[in-house]
Amino acid sequence: MAPSDPQRPLVLAVLVLAGTLIALPWATWGRSPIGQAGLVLLIALAGAAGLLRRGSDPPLRLPPLLLLGGILVGLSAIFTIYPDRTVQSLLLLLAYLVACGLAARAALQISWAERALLDTIWFSGLAVAGLAMLWWVRGNDGGFYANALIGPFGYPNAMGGFLLLAGFAALATLTPDRCRLEQGGALLGCAVSLLGLYLTRSRGVLLAAAVGLLVWALVRRERWWPRRPLWGIAAALAVLGGLALLGWRLSALLPLLWPGDGGTPDTSSQWRLHILRWTWAMVRDHPWTGVGPGAFPVALTHYQRLPYISGENPHNLYMEIAAEYGLAAGILVTGSLILFLGRAALAARRLPQGDPARGRQAALAGAVTAFALHSAIDLDWSFPAIALIAATILGIASARLPGLWMARPQGIGITLPRTLLILVLLVAAALALTRYYATSLVAWGRGDLAAGNLPGARQSLDQSRQLNPLGFPASYWLAWTTLRSGDPQGAIEVSQRTIRIAPQNPNGHALTGEIALVGGRWQIAQTAFRRAVEQAPMAHLWYHVGLIEATARVGTPAETLSAYERAVSTFTPERVLHPEARCLAPGDRYLLARISRIAAELHAGVGDSAQRQTTLDRARSLAQPDLRGICATERHPGQTSPEAAVMSFWHARSERGLPQAERFLLPERRGPTTGAARFAGAERDLPRRMRVAWILALSGDERNATLQYEVEGEQGEDRIIRCVQTVIRFRREGWFLEDYPSLENGACRP
């Protein structure tokens, strides 16, 4: 039956929600600026449409638990340590709540809404899994996860979390009241989801799927109980298979829990335990209001006790909530989720055995259980594409649970004016739009800055800061633009504004230190970097590098050497050479070499020749090119890393001339170009044989890198040195230079 006129706004809201569910995974999993802005904007507008008053609608009355949660969230937001991320987190949280409420209301008031939303979810999962498998067959363009199913998420555990929910949505569709075509598609969705879960190689998601299926089976036990011996054997085999998959990881935890000769612990498990310990320390220090919504990554730098062990979240949703919103909020969410699962299972059991809704409700209860378990061991919630599906499934499952989201007419609750809620949603939509435009202005400003258009860059960045006064990126790039415009004092003032907004963010202090260091304000640089090191001594080696370089200018040799010893005791040579450091901070070995050269000069100045030689040897060793891949071992000799590609280019030039060296450039950059002409002119004065002698700096990741290094050669009795800067890109065939190297006379300057 066609919907009546009063239902049309709600129908439109359901269609918008369904479209967002399909589109969000392709917007960088919902993490990109356009993905987050689109999510909040569309869901907020859909929620406003769904709230349009109809004469038969009862007043909106929220139950006590939801009201208490709102109070705790508000208090946490007031006392946040990082306002910008808090605003974004609150916008996303509001979008999830609205999606959940829309799904629940639509499932009750529109006969086809539940069916349409579940079909949308499993169809989206089928499309994502199909394309992901195609990429997997092709090797995912190489990289660390070349042999795992990652899809558009770029991370196998996230892909697993997405397929987990899509698979249960397909299972909920396998009921007798669905048409054959729909059932066939859902059956294919179940099969593809199971295969995809296996191909992610994620043991945690397989465990979550098994527990979710167990809940589904227990709710539907009347169907298999008569044949319980057969099903019991199948369940036992499944349990044994699960233990075999998970056993080696559990055994890897033993050396962490009971130190001894138990072997080397699993790196991933070790990382998670460290993060959880530091997160619990954060909860103990901020038990009432937490550190603020979305502020966990900034707060973690204060508690980090080992380098290269950090992250955006602790891979445990409940600990993250307790850390960000306070312990009471963590307990409230955990308790409410347990209460919901119990009520959902009981509601399904009360339905008649032949009712298709019973099987559907059982599958939805299994989906929520699986998501709840996987959220305790991974980061599903941090991917908006997954969180939105979870919120939608939660809403559909709660539609048959009266009083859960809306208070009963005679129950305890508070009546909310629809006009007020619509106004809140419209404000959220406007905020999402302005924040996205502010992010776009930052991107345009960076482009103008790179092109040398300083007035244009300044205008864009100023506008961005006006639209989002709390944003760090706009102030960061505006400070550098102001510095390049010849106003070091103005640049320092811009950077110090970020400290006033978020004084506990060490990156704000480090930005002021960088600007002051380049601008020659050594005392300001020393103070700023010292504050960054005090706040987050384990977060980044470059905090220590800045402090050492500033102290070398204004402090005594003893102060500088003391700062160096502190840095090298934390970021030891062994640690910066570790594969984990190579993946997370590939340039740290060269930063340590840089400050070791400074320390060697200071040791020479105080007459300690033995220590000078030791430190200089350390610097030489660390500054040698690293031929290992970044985050992965590539099978392309001579192009396994950015440094290897650069060495191959110069070696080919020395041995066989420039035409042979061109094969280490990106194919589209080979041949006569402006870069080729510039390089040909600069290399005429160079000896034929030049070698890479010293790596000064490397910045980038496993796909893109910028390398600053020195090449040297001999011309008669003269030693020729050139400072070179090169951008290198990763392709399936290995690393390639983006363009011909840019040469400067003499040694590189820091």
Model-derived features with residue positions:
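Short solvent-exposed beta->alpha transition segments
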Residues: 634-638, 643-644, 648-704
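Exposed beta-sheet edge and beta->alpha loop/turn motif
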Residues: 687-689, 696-750
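Internal/C-terminal transmembrane anchor helices
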Residues: 230-246, 410-437
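Transmembrane signal-anchor/signal-peptide helices with a preference for the extracytoplasmic
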Residues: 103, 373, 427-446
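C-terminal luminal/periplasmic domains and tails of membrane-associated envelope-modifying transferases
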Residues: 442-639, 649, 657-664, 745-750
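TM-adjacent membrane-interface loops and short helices in multi-pass inner/ER membrane proteins
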Residues: 155, 273-314, 318-321, 325-332
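Flexible juxtamembrane loops connecting transmembrane helices in multi-pass membrane enzymes
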Residues: 148-152, 209-213, 243-278, 284, ...
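Alpha-helical transmembrane segments of multi-pass inner-membrane proteins
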Residues: 3-27, 37-51, 70-77, 83, ...
